[in-house]
Amino acid sequence: MGRIIGIDLGTTNSCVAIMEGNTPKVIENSEGARTTPSIIAYQEDGEVLVGASAKRQAVTNPKNTLYAVKRLIGRKFTEKEVQKDINLMPYKIAAADNGDAWVEVRGNRMAPQQVSADVLRKMKKTAEDYLGETVTEAVITVPAYFNDAQRQATKDAGRIAGLDVKRIINEPTAAALAYGLDKTEKGDRKIAVFDLGGGTFDVSIIEIADVDGEKQFEVLSTNGDTFLGGEDFDQRIIDFVIAEFKKEQGVDLGKDVLALQRLKEAAEKAKIELSSSAQTDINLPYVTADASGPKHLSIKLTRAKLESLVEELIERTIAPCRTAIKDAGVNVADINDVILVGGMTRMPKVQEKVKELFGREPRKDVNPDEAVAVGAAIQGQVLSGDRKDVLLLDVTPLSLGIETLGGVMTKMITKNTTIPTKFAQTFSTADDNQPAVTIKVFQGEREIAAGNKMLGEFNLEGIPPSARGTPQIEVSFDIDANGILHVGAKDKGTGKENKITIKANSGLTEAEIQQMVKDAELNAADDKRKLDLVQAKNQADASLHSVKKSLTEYGDKLEAGEKEKIEEAIKHLEEAIKGDDKAHIEEKSTALMTISQKLGEKMYADMQAKQAAEAGAGDPGAQAAAGAQNTSNQAADDNVVDAEVKEVKKG
């Protein structure tokens, strides 16, 4: 198996890392930088520039240079955040046919996924150049507060870039992995990850625990704002400079896309400089021109002025932090460390606010630009099976279920369900007087259980003699915080139960997971055919059982010829069930039901007569009550999955 790389797909900058042994390595790009600007430029000749080269030509090509596209991914055009960006971005944002927010470049509409795929392709190439081998698998990070559409869109971007995205993980969780892996402190530690990046803000409360020599990372809570980040800080500076220049020169730079692109670059540079100095100059000669000639821009910006411009933005990070602390069920005093992630956390005022809120100095030993990519690389190593001392409480990679009648895989917990989780379903017996059931637990995506990986089996014995479909066997699946799967079966009638514990996720290598997903796709048609055949056989078996039972009770009321025809149809259907011809089974099943109509009529007439006799002449409501009771019983039966557990085979 090839390496699984870790990619931090950022709004402003992106980063790629791998693991060399147990040491993370952030890979330098072709320009020698450890981070790559998430900027993409589409040239007139069709060439696509990504990163620093795209950033350098942005001033002369503003309408075809895309940045901060991550803020559009998975969003609808009508969302207020998108509408806000339309008025700020030099490039065109358009509505797709499905209502999504797309971008328009050189007359072509493009999905944000396609644009992000160009950045991911650059990250992939950076890793391949370093490793000297093809890279096909990656763990990609997303803001913790991303919704399902945004997560799926990010995964699609990976696929477009030629990457098999093994996992989408949250940026704060990845940063916690990077921080906590080399820490030697014993006992459980709770950390807050404050992640203020280029376009999004997240805060997560995470518990790091030592469990039998493993480091366990459990996310207790998360909160954030997917439209708050460095881009907004830059915009405050741009707005300020535009206003000042208009006062001085009477010219509105906001209507000049070339000037705006230069301003964007200057604002970002000034913001960075003010993290280490008290004052900076924004100088843009020949920024524009009017009838009187060229205009030059020269403005002094102090740190104090910048802080006043962005005060409201910094304040917006506080409420999500308080909510996350509350949702985690902890007090501020319980938090051992605060980790800063994202370039904006280098701003002294942000650090000051974090210290004020959490009552402690934030840690400075985590690189805010690289920690997320490093964490993604660590998770990639865990997924590949090369690292077993780390447990990240995340999702189950494959569906979990049990084998039911006909070898069908009945899924209890579907893949990508967040763990810990619980699920229970009621099944019944397949035969009359069945004394025991065998519960076989499988993991995989195939519809037929045999195509999946069997994790274990156990018996539930001592079921009292009763007709098939009568006992109610509750099967429960429970994945706990350790990633351990507990399966139980309980007879609701007697209270008897049995349990088995399975280490669900450690039972598969990543290669097996890949193979199963591939098999599921390749064999989808074959599985569908087998599933349809099993269902036809189960339906036919139910018909046989029903007709045989009715024939025993009411057969003497039929003429000899009619009874013989039904018995002959029963034999034909029993023979058909032995084969694998679905159409033949359905044909014989239909024939049996058609020929059994006379038997049904006799049953109905007999029931009507009995009800009339019981009701009596003086109680006309009794018959209706009897009918209602029958309907109620039927409804209760409908809640039980009928005849779906095999009888245990005694050796």
Curated annotation (Swiss-Prot):
Region annotation (Disordered) ranges: 608-651
Residues bearing the modification Phosphothreonine: T200
Signals that turn on the gene: By stress conditions e.g. heat shock.
Q: Keywords of this protein's UniProt record, alphabetized?
A: ATP-binding, Chaperone, Nucleotide-binding, Phosphoprotein, Stress response
Q: Which PANTHER family match?
A: HEAT SHOCK PROTEIN 70KDA
Sorted alphabetically, which NCBIfam families does this protein's record hold? PRK00290.1 (NF001413), PRK05183.1 (NF003520), prok_dnaK (TIGR02350)
Q: What does this protein do?
A: Acts as a chaperone.
Q: Can you name this protein?
A: Chaperone protein DnaK
Organism field: Albidiferax ferrireducens (strain ATCC BAA-621 / DSM 15236 / T118)
The gene name on file is: dnaK
